[in-house]
């Protein structure tokens, strides 16, 4: 998309799991659990998440996130997707902007100073589900692992970060 890096200098010939040591752009950030390889890259101080997926899935997720963003729903910002063909290997990747000041749900349990937010977890994710439903979206894999949270005036705001199973 316009206004974002082109990401052409990344080692796309390799799976994301092999990127450490292949690019200086990798950043370690606090993250949740993911069933797919995920890396974070830095371009001039802006962080981006890249998630490797089976062929075609990244395009579908990218399109769903664009639709959600157009409706101003709380989700990560889609930046682009990549279709990768290397030899017999076919895969894809989605690129999203890193959600600044966000926390994976596990952080709310691991850090004692965040304990007051634990009671707001269910309210936040329920609120997200209501917003998605009212906008006509179905989220087939709703879980805390597919959600990030931002603190908001003593409460939490939930953000969808994994749209693989949305319709």
Predicted feature locations:
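Conserved ATP-binding subdomain of kinase catalytic cores across diverse folds
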Residues: 6-140, 156
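Catalytic activation segment of kinase domains across protein kinase-like and atypical kinase folds
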Residues: 138, 144-167
């Amino acid at each position: 998309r316009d206004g974002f890096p082109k990401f052409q200098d990344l080692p796309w010939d390799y799976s994301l799991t092999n990127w450490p040591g292949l690019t200086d752009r990798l950043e370690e950030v606090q993250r949740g659990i993911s069933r797919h390889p995920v890396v974070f890259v830095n371009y001039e101080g802006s962080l981006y998440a890249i998630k490797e997926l089976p062929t075609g899935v990244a395009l579908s997720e990218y399109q769903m996130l664009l639709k959600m963003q157009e409706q101003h729903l709380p989700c990560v910002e889609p930046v682009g997707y990549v279709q990768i063909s290397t030899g017999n290997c076919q895969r894809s990747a989605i690129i999203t902007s890193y959600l600044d000041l966000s926390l994976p749900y596990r952080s709310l349990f691991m850090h004692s100073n965040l304990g007051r937010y634990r009671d707001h977890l269910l309210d936040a994710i329920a609120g997200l589900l209501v917003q998605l439903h009212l906008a006509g979206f179905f989220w087939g894999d709703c879980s805390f692992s597919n959600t990030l949270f931002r603190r908001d005036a003593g409460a939490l705001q939930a953000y969808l970060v994994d749209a693989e199973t949305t319709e």
